Amino acid sequence: MRVIVNGEAREIASERVDALLSELEYEGSNFAIAVNYDVLPKSRWAETALKPGDEIEIITPRQGG
């Protein structure tokens, strides 16, 4: 299905947030996920279904000053 990930249109096979993270090779838990501007707690990643056209933001911490 076609979704937007971090502002970029992508064709993905995943149907849930947790599967998308695996598909995109994100590991660990040092990031936050928002679907259609709704930040999801990690406890909901496995149950949150994705739909065509969803906008997903994967937010990772950055070091800087």
Which residues does each PLM region occupy?
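Ubiquitin-like/PB1-type beta-grasp interaction modules and other compact soluble beta-rich domains
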Residues: M1-G64
